[in-house]
Amino acid sequence: DQPAERMQDDISSEHHPFFDPVKRCCKYGWTCVLGCSPCGC
C-alpha cells in the first residue's frame, strides 16, 4: 500500500502550473475548477 501513488488519483496539485511550492497551494482561486488546491478559494 503506497500513499504516494494513492495521492495521484486526485489531480496532483504539485504538478499544476500554478502550484506555489512554498504555500503548498495554487496561486489563483479559480484553479478550484482545474483540480488544484487554491490558496484562497
From Swiss-Prot:
Q: What is the lineage of its organism?
A: Eukaryota, Metazoa, Spiralia, Lophotrochozoa, Mollusca
Family under the similarity heading: Belongs to the conotoxin M superfamily.
State the domain notes.
The cysteine framework is IV (CC-C-C-C-C).
Q: Which residues form the propeptide?
A: 1-24
Q: Please tell me in which tissues this protein is expressed.
A: Expressed by the venom duct.
Q: How is it modified after translation?
A: Contains 3 disulfide bonds. They are not added, since framework IV presents two different connectivities (I-V, II-III, IV-VI and I-III, II-V, IV-VI).
Gene Ontology molecular functions: sodium channel regulator activity; toxin activity
Function of the protein: Mu-conotoxins block voltage-gated sodium channels (Nav). Blocks reversibly sodium channels in molluskan neurons, but has no effect on sodium currents in bovine chromaffin cells or in rat brain synaptosomes. Induces paralysis in mollusks (C.retripictus).
Protein name according to UniProt = Mu-conotoxin pn4c
